[in-house]
Design a protein with these regions (language model features):
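Lipid interaction determinants
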Residues: 2-142
Length: 142
């Protein structure tokens, strides 16, 4: 009887291990990994809607890097998530001038450059809030 029980117990334990590896942990739902599009930005108490004809995107990669486009210029850097905080490294960006979008571009890049910001996720929306709580960037999952 013991010889039959041991293989069954081993098989059961192995099955549980394999199935638990396939289930999702709750952490994935709070990860910014993915592609996002700008919705609003600026003053937290009265954010400005994103310019309608300017697609601003940010793509957070699971390797700790991110990049995107602020309509005219492309940018990239690294980031680290710790709880509800994201720390961004120095941004590398192209530096073209495009009339009419400089406020949006400078505000978005300003909150992402060499800073730690808090973030929250609600459904398919990611909100980045400056350390002083005065500035926000709100993004929608693309």
């Amino acid at each position: 009887m013991k010889k039959t029980s041991l293989p069954l117990v081993t098989l059961f334990a192995l099955s549980v291990l394999i199935l638990s590896a396939c289930t999702s942990s709750g952490a994935a739902s709070t990860s910014p990994v993915g592609e996002w599009t700008l919705v609003t930005y600026g003053d937290a108490s009265n954010p400005t809607p994103a310019l309608p004809d300017v697609e601003t995107t940010i793509n957070f990669n699971d390797d700790g890097t991110f990049g995107g486009s602020v309509g005219c210029n492309s940018f990239g850097s690294d980031y680290k998530v710790d709880g509800d905080q994201i720390t961004f490294g120095s941004i590398v960006s192209t530096m073209m001038f495009c009339e009419g979008i400089s406020d949006q571009e400078s505000t978005v890049l300003g909150i992402l450059t060499d800073k730690t910001v808090s973030f929250s996720m609600n459904d398919d929306q990611l909100t980045l809030t400056s350390e002083d709580g005065n500035s926000v960037v709100v993004l929608a999952r693309k």
